[in-house]
Amino acid sequence: MLNKLINSILLLAVMAFGVSGGLVAADAIDDITPVTDEMLLNPSDGDWLMWRRTYDGWGYSPLDQINKGNVSELKLAWAWGMSPGGRTQETPVVHDGIMFVQNSSHLIQALDASNGDLIWEYDYDLPDDARTQGVRSKAIYGDNLIIATRDARLLSINAKTGQLNWNKQVANYKKGYSFSSGPIVANGVIVQGATGCSKAQPGGCFITGHDPATGAEIWRVNTIARGDTPEGNSWNGVPLASRHGGSAWISGSYDPDTNLILIGVGQPYPWNMEMAGLKPKISDLRVSNDALYTNSTLAIDANTGEIKWYHQYLPTDGLDLDYVYERVLIDLPFNGKMRKQVVTTGKIGIIESVDRTTGEWLWAKETVRQNIVLSWDKKTGKKTINPDTFPVAGETTVNCPADPGAHAWQPAGYSPLTKAMYVPTVEFCSNTTVKTLDPGEIYTGGGMQTYSRVEHPDGDSNIGQIFAINMTDQSELWQYRQRAPLTSSTLPTGGGVVFVGSMDRYFLAFDDTTGEKLWSSGKLSNALESFPITYTAGGKQYVAIMANHKSGLGRLSSITPEIQLPPDNPATLYVFALPN
C-alpha cells in the first residue's frame, strides 16, 4: 500500500516539476514574515531556519505532536521529485509554512509545506563545466534566501517572489573552488566556507563574511596558516604555494554570547605526508609539521573575521581523517565546573569537547573500535598515533577506520531533554595503499591513496550504528547496531523520538531514552543520505527527509554488496505526518 501511494505521489510530483512559476493562493506567500536576528536566536517551534535549526548545532526540534506513543502511526503525507542528475544532500528551510529547497541543478523552489504545492521557482544557470551537485544547506534572513552555489557564488533571492536580488562571485570555480554547504547568518553577517582546495591551489581554502544587503565581502580568513608565526611555521618549511587543503566544507555554529563562529577545517592535501612535504620532519626547531589550521576548530569573530582561538585535533593527517564536521554547542558541567563546550566527532569516530571560550581541550570518548589513536593526553588531548597505520608509499596498511570515516558529514543531534547526543557512525576497516607520483608528475589534487574496505576483524556484520552518549558524564546511554550504515543526520525531538535515515532505504524512529526502534518507513526510492527536519504547517507536525545516493558514503557498499541501490534515481523529498 505504501509503495502504491509513493508511486502516485511521485507521478504528481514529476508532473508538477515541469510547471514554471506555479502559484498557490496569493496570501500564502505574502504572509511570510521577515526573518530577524531575534528569530534566528529563538526560532518558532514550527520553523526550521538553518542547517541544524539553531545556532548551537543541536539539530533538535521541540515539537511533540509526533511522540513515542504515536510515531508508529506515521504515514506518507506528500513527496516531491527533485531535478535529475547530481547529488542532493538537501536540508530544506521552512518558515511560516513555506518550504524552500535547492535542487542539484540549482533550481530553487518554494513549496507549500503542508502539501508540496509549488509556489515559485528560480532556476540559477549553473555553468556546464561546474559540478552539478546540490549544496547541503541555505540561509534565510530578512525577506531573502541566501544561497551558495557550486560555482563559488552567493545569491540573494526574495523569499516571497523568487526574484534575484544580487549575485556575488566569491572565488573562481575554474580553479576548483566550490561551495558544498551553505552559509549561516550570524549577527548580521553571512558566513560562508569554501571547498575545492585540494586541486593544487596554492595557500588552501578560506572562510568569508559578507554583507547581506549587497553580498560584499567584509572579511576573509585563510584556513592554512601563513607568515612568520608559530602557526605559519607549522608546515615543515613547505612554501605557501605548495600548501594544499584546509577546506571548510561544513557549515559552522554560532555562539551569540561571545559573538564567535565555531567552524571546522578539513585535512591537508595530498594525504601522503611525504608528498605533502610534511614528512620527514625537518631539523629546524622553529618549525613544526602540524599543518595548521587543518583538522581544527576555528573560533572566529563574526563581525571582524579575527581568529580568537583554535584547537587542532589531528596534526599531520595522512589518512583523510578530517575533523571538519558539525560543532555542537552545549553548556554542561565537566569535572564539577560548568563549561561552555563545543563538541565534534571526527572521522576516527572519537567525540571530543573543547571549551568554546578559550579553546581548552576537555574530554574525548570513542564510539567505534579503531586502531589509529593509541592514547591521548588527558589534559591536552594530544594524541599518540599508531605508527603501524602511517601510510607509506608502495606499502599497504590496515586502518580502522579510513575514508569515508567512522563519522562523516551526517551530524549528530543533541536533545536537551535527555542531555544526550546521538552520533551516527560506521565501524569498518580498510587496506590502504598509497599512490605515488610518476617522475616529473605534478600534484593536481586528490588524496593519492586507494582503499579496500572491509568489516572490522573484531566486529560483526552490523557496521551501522547510533551511539547515544550521556553528555553530563560521557557514559554510553545506548547503542543501536544494524547491517546497513546510518546515512543521515540524527533528528531528536520534543516527543522523545530520534529520527535517522539508512543506506538500505528506510527512515527510522527510535526512543530517545532506550534506543528501542519505534517505527520504520517502507522502502523508499533510494538511500537516505541527507538531513531530516521536522516543522509545522497549518498547526500540523511533519517530518521530512531527502532520498538520494551519491555521497562518499557509497564507498561502503563494497562491504554491503547485498544492499542494492538504483544508481541514477533523481532525489526525492519524502514528508511524513500522523493521519488526520
Identify the meaning behind each predicted range:
Residues 27-76, 223-230, 385, 455-456, ...:
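Blade/loop signatures of beta-propeller domains
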Residues 80-93, 121-142, 167-182, 222-251, ...:
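Extracytoplasmic beta-rich repeat domains
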Residues 204-216, 283-286, 290-304, 359, ...:
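Beta-propeller blade signature
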Residues 458-516:
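Loop/turn-rich, solvent-exposed surfaces of beta-rich toroidal or solenoidal domains
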